[in-house]
Amino acid sequence: MNTTQALHYDVVIMGAGFAGLCQARHLMLNIPNIRVALIDPRPENRPDTDLKIGESTVEIAALLICKELGLHDYMIENHPPKAGLNFHWPKNPAETDSIDDYYHVWINRQPPIPTFQINRAKFERDLLKMNKEMGAIFYNGRVVDVDLTEGDQLKTVTVKLEDTTIEITAKHIVDAAGRRFIIGKKTDNLIFGSDQLLGVNNGSAWVRIKDVDRTIFHSGYHPAGTTVSHYYATNHYFGPGHWLWMIPIDRDSKELSLGVIHHHDVIPSATINTQEKFTAFLKANHTVLYKLLQSSELVDFHYLPRVAHKSKVMFSPDNWYVVGDAACIFDAFYSLGTTMIAIAVESITEIVRAKLANEANAEEKRAVYNDFNLAFTDSVNTFMQEHQKQLGHASIMSWRIYFEYMWWFGVLVPMYIGKWHLDPAFLKQFTGPFRTFLNGLFVDVYQDSNQLVERGVNMGLMDAIRADQLIGSYYTFKHFEDFLENSKLEPQRCNIFTGMKNTFFYVAIWYAMFQWKGFGWRGLLKPRNLANFSYLLAQSGLSALGEMRHNFLTRSLPDNSEIEEMRQEFKEYRYQGKLQPWIAELS
């Protein structure tokens, strides 16, 4: 049976996984009375085996889920807490029987912004139910065609349900259907191939296991080393051309996600693409993880031969959008997939809101947001560049992690908190220099790192967690403004330029140390390196001017409007030392 009945919405979202469900909820929370449809071939009560890469959140993704989507209580009650990231390198690759056989960068305290591990099947099942309760309409079917008309013309999505075919129309279409690439294929919007992805050429094998004996990993007793759990962190293990994750995704069933990202030119697909080969790889190279695997019950095994891809356009002038795996992914390292989703979700909501309201600058926002999101995804691509050569070198990789953490906590996290990624004026100034750093300083650091790996240089283990590595008790997730303490959570209340000023300065110090320890005086005095050092200091100075300007322009604004309103109201407070009667109510 077929029907040509037309069903109309403001936004149709193809795909009801993490990206699509977060997008739907964010739209409904921020645009009153918006009509949203979700389409997915998976049933509402999807099974617990409906799992995929991406179970660990970092700060920006956690802020999206907990703050922007209002799900903090839900996360506390339903998903494991995350105690930061740990990094492990074998002391001797031939001896990896226990965690003591590794060098470590342990997280030693709870980071300031809470993060979580996610059981994706449960999260998506629960969030779909919440979205339906908020008014979203769910179609359990498969998209068979989408007519992407130009501009503001209505788009039509043809959906095959169980016993009928329907057509759904909307002005805005979001592809969150993952690797089906519904829009990507139709518009030739996808970019594959390591030659166009900064050399990233990786695959992934992973298992879900339950009833794990976690004491094989760690006893949980480390009183002199940490104030947080080692097990409930995301643990990373490294070796030549690969890294592994170990993520607890369910407390009751003691379930773990355990997987590897491997680079094909070091570890060919044919050597690791089955459960047996993956198990043998663990036994030979990370025996402690093999023992953990043997202690458990297998839930499932997966292999993905090609991880990395990106899109040419993320937000089209023709009112279509790609988000999540439908848009891009490069690697699971640093768990940045959900971060790219978070920034894209908020960008899409603001574009849709502006266009539905017929705001004059709606198209300008779309263009600026598209440029920034492409630049941000390119930065994630850049963070994965040259991994195949550097992952297994404990010294060089630890310095690299420190370097990348500095940008994350010093610039990107405060940018998200202050909603600067939604400020077109700021983005126009930021995106160009951001790309300059990606194509200049980052490339130089990674090329120098390759030289140091080839020479077998030991520069020491750079600990991204501790405050004794640079000058002035600096540590990477230190923030330089009181945006958390004084809840500067409204748009542009936190001063992004403060974070940028300090980050540029400390990166300059890191860069000088890196050159000195790696190359000596020749490294310090090399003209290219002097230029990079000078440019960092110049950007720090320019950011200081931006900091002063922003402080001046916002001098009359309170840090937080709700707190200011309460303080004004409190001026009328008078103590009343009298209880209200209650016994009479009982009688």
Q: Model-derived features: where do they sit?
A:
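Predominantly flavin-linked oxidoreductase catalytic cores and closely associated redox partners
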Residues: 46, 130-287, 345
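Beta1/beta-strand and adjacent pyrophosphate-binding region of the FAD-binding site
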Residues: 4-19, 37
